[in-house]
């Protein structure tokens, strides 16, 4: 049996309180406090790495920055970010407690982030050998609090030689990282479905559905590019078809892509067939934090504006909101993968009722999602001038992992492999993809 640890964060006023404990060991607990200027400093560093617009940036400018100039564009920049996040967000005693639990098999670390820390890629964090001078950190924290409000602390990092402050060991190398399903969702009335009961049933594959009225190169256009039987993804799904039945029933794998019939009625009909798992690859829209409701997060299927739902139409298309999914009580399978822009953003809201919560409330016990927008195949190739397709790689990796007995272990193993490729100089193993993946589990599901 592996050791289980739980890392929790809670925003209370201007501070974020953290605790780390070992399940079954009352004495194995560490607590610490993150002051608002420190949290803001961490978020500012992360924002510079993400392909989401910052300030007046356009989507295109944000993607260009993230792929070519941001911290995730080079191994040195990514390691520096990983070190800064590790030094700011996890206390030295907490790092020590995690290190003390390292064994074979790896411990499992369940993380419940606060709203402020909802998009932190926890597995990426690097173990610091040393951190900022404590007195300088206190001074920077105090200077960040002004009559006009609180700003990000301006910390004087000593980063001329990154190897002197971290050996590059990551949290994902110390433990298998899982996000805990928010308590209000995990304890809500629902009818869960277990993997062992459904594992032999067909997999439901919703792959890059065609959003009505959207050109292939538009913001809601194709994620994977022009369908072809010669692509790595088509070959992967072709091999899957040869081994087992899938939904929808198709004669060739290429027929899974860019379907025009994949609307909410089609989805509901196929979910009634009790599939073993659901893979969705496409577009999602995160709920607007200013709006205040996580259930406004949406999936973009092939639904026209005539479809029933609570979302406002986008041209001739009506998005499928998380609230629509919950209201319809669609029977979700035990495992769900939502490889879509920021689909794992539930924790950004006090009431974590986003897309992940919707799937759990509808029956799922394990949901894999993303923390931020994944660059499309076309976007990646445009700005890197490379022929590789990391979007296809992540889809294949998640699809294979969700077929395994222990999906959590398989996904963490793949992320470690990608991180080590990146660390060893393989520029095609971009952290914009592997670091974005998070898996939510309820009831000890693996």
List PLM regions with ranges.
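Non-catalytic, solvent-exposed interaction/assembly segments
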Residues: 1-121
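Helix-enriched interaction subdomains in cytosolic or periplasmic regions
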Residues: 74-76, 107-186, 288-312
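Caspase-like cysteine protease fold
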Residues: 179-182, 301-332, 373-446
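Short hydrophobic alpha-helical runs that function as membrane-insertion/retention elements
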Residues: 366-370
